[in-house]
Amino acid sequence: MRHIFQRLLPRRLWLAGLPCLALLGCVQNHNKPAIDTPAEEKIPVYQLADYLSTECSDIWALQGKSTETNPLYWLRAMDCADRLMPAQSRQQARQYDDGSWQNTFKQGILLADAKITPYERRQLVARIEALSTEIPAQVRPLYQLWRDGQALQLQLAEERQRYSKLQQSSDSELDTLRQQHHVLQQQLELTTRKLENLTDIERQLSTRKPAGNFSPDTPHESEKPAPSTHEVTPDEP
């Protein structure tokens, strides 16, 4: 009997300790960080409407806060503006002259590739820049990229104008050099002809034989001319 009691006692103690061990394991697992499970990324639940399928004929009529604060709308507007002819862009831009940032930005997008002058482009950028504080934060990065593109266009126009002036100056200098070259060429030809004439004269002089002291035209002393019959001969004494 005692032997049986000794065998059952440790088993009862072991069974009684199982709940404690289970609780201890739960506490340890609770405090242990979950290394194996990947951390879930917190993505804001916010979806933007995609205007890629919107017809270009309808894109300009869309308005409202949800549309005007959507950068995808402005990207689609830029894409549609690139497909217009310059005259069409100017005609469309005349409809947005109320002075709001939305319509001013639309004007800028439409006129950017309408073959405007650098002065018109500079004035256009200045008007939009004056309203830049009203542009929503969602659209501001896109607007800044557009503004940087316009600044590059103005810089390119200045470089072209500077190159044109240099080319005109170079052309004028080239014309002057051509005229000087023509004058020098004429002088060189005249000098060459003079040298050729002098060379011919020297050649002619060198081919002549040198003459002696006797001249056939001069009569010899012994050959005096006979007195003329008309000469009067004095009488001898």
Swiss-Prot record:
Membrane topology: Lipid-anchor
Pfam families per record: Lipoprotein_20 (PF13942)
UniProt keyword Lipoprotein present: yes
Positions of the UniProt region annotated as Disordered: 201-237
One GO CC annotation: cell outer membrane
Keywords from the named record: Cell outer membrane, Lipoprotein, Membrane, Palmitate, Signal
Lipid attachment locations (S-diacylglycerol cysteine): 26
Lipid moiety-binding residues (N-palmitoyl cysteine): 26
Superkingdom, natural source: Bacteria
Signal sequence segment: 1-25
Cellular compartment(s): Cell outer membrane
Disrupted gene: phenotype observed: Mutants are unable to form pedestals.
Free-text function comment from the UniProt entry: Involved in the regulation of virulence and metabolism in EHEC. Required for pedestal formation in host epithelial cells during infection. Necessary for translocation of effector molecules into host epithelial cells, but is not involved in structural assembly of the type III secretion system (T3SS).
Stored NCBIfam families: PRK10722.1
Name of this chain's protein: Quorum-sensing regulator protein G
Biological source species: Escherichia coli O157:H7
Top-level taxonomy: Bacteria, Pseudomonadati, Pseudomonadota, Gammaproteobacteria, Enterobacterales
